[in-house]
A protein has these predicted regions:
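Alpha-helix C-capping/helix-to-loop hinge sites
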Residues: 12-16, 40, 92
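A beta-strand edge to alpha-helix "cap/lid" segment located at domain peripheries
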Residues: 1-4, 8, 59-135
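Generic secondary-structure transition motif, activating predominantly at the C-termini of alpha-helices
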Residues: 13, 17, 33, 62, ...
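Generic structural signal for secondary-structure transition and capping sites
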Residues: 17, 21, 38, 66-67, ...
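Short acidic-aromatic low-complexity motifs
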Residues: 1-32
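A solvent-exposed, acidic/Ser-Thr-rich amphipathic alpha-helical stretch
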Residues: 26-81
């Protein structure tokens, strides 16, 4: 099951090479999610629920950038139902024009071939702890 989970995570991030590709692939990426998927973000701890909520989160996030891409650095099989994805967000803010480059982590829980939960982290220690891993 673990290799299958890594493959699902890989498909989730495939269109992340550009903002345009992410938006165009939204129906395909949402199909990888369980209808009641949950995504918790670190900014304020908000949890977006359901495919519609997750889709809205992605669209709002992408709207805050003129240019955006997500570069997967590695996908770690955590065993069981989880994979930890380390990535780099690269973009230019829509309002400020400022260049952004930031590392983040997303812990995906996958059951029966579908993403059921995404927890996002900006702190390496927090991400590895949540995944039950050591850095």
């Amino acid at each position: 099951m673990s290799q299958e989970n890594v493959e699902i995570a890989t498909r989730w991030y495939e269109p992340a090479a550009s903002k345009r590709q992410l938006l165009a692939a939204m129906p395909r990426t949402m199909a990888l999610c369980h209808p009641r998927v949950e995504w918790t973000v670190p900014e304020d701890g908000t949890t977006y629920r359901g495919r519609e909520g997750v889709s809205q989160r992605l669209k709002e996030w992408l709207e805050s950038f003129d240019d955006y891409r997500y570069e997967v650095q590695r996908i770690i099989d955590c065993g069981g139902n989880e994979v930890l994805v380390e990535g780099t967000e690269v973009g230019r803010g829509a309002a400020s024009g400022a260049e952004v480059r930031s590392t983040n982590y997303e812990l995906l829980t996958i059951r029966d071939g579908m993403i059921v939960r995404i927890r996002e982290f900006y702190d390496t220690g927090d991400a590895f702890e949540a995944a039950g891993l050591r850095e």
